[in-house]
Structure formats: structure tokens, C-alpha cells
Amino acid sequence: MTMAPHNPLLKYYDFGKDMKVDSIRHNGGCFAYFGEGSIIPEGTEIFMRYDYDTVAVNSRAQIHGEVSTWAYKANDKSGRVVMTGSHPEAVVSGERLQFMAAMVQYAMEGNGQPTVKGELRPNEIRQMIKGTADNDPAYTAIGDRQYHHFTLTVPKGVKKARITLNGIEGKDNFDLSLLAKEGDFAFHRTAHLQDVSLGCDKTLVIEKPKAGQWYIAVRCETTVETRNGKYGTEYIGRRDVLNGVPYTLCVTFE
């Protein structure tokens, strides 16, 4: 495969400085079609093209010069998808391994910015109880290892802000964490306050909170386990979490 001069994968490795990666296994599979009638979305990045005379090896399709590796990121809030039509995934050394590693790194670098589910208002119970099929993510139950982020506007003069998280009866045998941070998204490594105890029900009390915008987060700690089965990876353990964990949030000021 030959590399485009602007290839972002070059930030991770130089690939021998010849702008090529040689001898990547190809099973006569796909390439990205950018010709007439193409449905490739605008903004798709082209990284590499095939340097391969398929006619010489009696292939059904000529792929020389076609796009072999590409990526797409819809916006700042979405992730990045990086694709290739060949198979570098089983290689354990050299430039082909670097190629696979660079694709993974570029995809991870393209993680979307966190989004806010909504504003928490004093004395209003926010019910996060809907299912994915309801197509209403602002009020959908949380999935395993997910964060849900909310904002909270604290006025001047508040002595205490109390944030209460509750599970839903009959569906509360899960572990949820509750986090708070002033001025920015709350994660485990950055939160000013957090309760990571077992169970769903939590309460955070912020003494003399600074006026302005706070970020409140809920994280589902319960997750599935995996094992190798007859047909590949299987989920075991807490598979019920895959249906989502419903909960409610309420804020009060004193």
C-alpha cells in the first residue's frame, strides 16, 4: 500500500520513511469507491491506496490505485471509524503491526467530546428510565461502564446543594457512582466529590458550593464478563445490565 503525504498515521510511526507498507494480506476484499455515484460521506479521509496488480494474480477485480484505508468522523461529538480493506491484524512485528497499531491509535484519538444529557433543576426529579427503542437518549437508562453527564446552575447564596441518586425498585441491584465537579465534566479521575460505594442509591452534599455551573455525572460500574466459547467471545455474568439501568436524579438547595 502507498501512503498519502498527509497520512495522519505518520504521527505514530514513519513506516521505514518510504511511504509504503508492503505485503499486507488481502483476500480480494473491499476498497472504498470514490467514483461516480459514490455514497462515501463528505469529510472522509483517505490514507492509503493499493499498490497491487490484481490482474497478474487472476483476481476478479482490479484494485491497484484504489483506496485501501480510510477514516470518518462526523463531528466533534462522535467517535472516529478507521477502516482498511486488508488484514494486518494477525501480524506480530514490523511495519504491518505498526500499521494496525496506528489505525487503533488514530481511532482512539478521535473519541468524541462528552455530551450533556440536560440541566438538573432544583426540586425536579429527572427520570432516566427509557429504553433504547424509545429513541430519547436524554432520558434513557444508563449502560454498563457509561457516564451520563448533567449540568447544574448554582445561584449565589446557596449554603448546601444536595444531589440524590436513586435506583428504580426491582431494577436496583446494580452499582452506580455519583460524581460532581465545578466548571467541567466530572470523571472518576477529576471529580471534586464522588460516591463510589456499592448499590444504586447515593447522595452528595456540596457545602457552600461556588455559584455558577456544576457538572453532575452518573456512572454504571456493573458490567458483564467475557469468556471464549464455541463460537467466539461470549458474555457471562451480569448480562441483565445490557438492557440498561434506570435511575432518578434530584437536586435540592438550602
Task: Please state what every model-predicted region is.
Residues M1-T2, V57-Q146, T233-E254:
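Extracellular ligand-binding/catalytic regions of CAZymes and related secreted enzymes
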Residues V92-S93, G167-D175, V224-T226:
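Extended, low-complexity, turn-rich repeat/linker tracts enriched in Gly/Pro/Ser/Thr and Asp/Glu
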Residues V158-G170:
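Short amphipathic, basic-aromatic surface patches that mediate peripheral association
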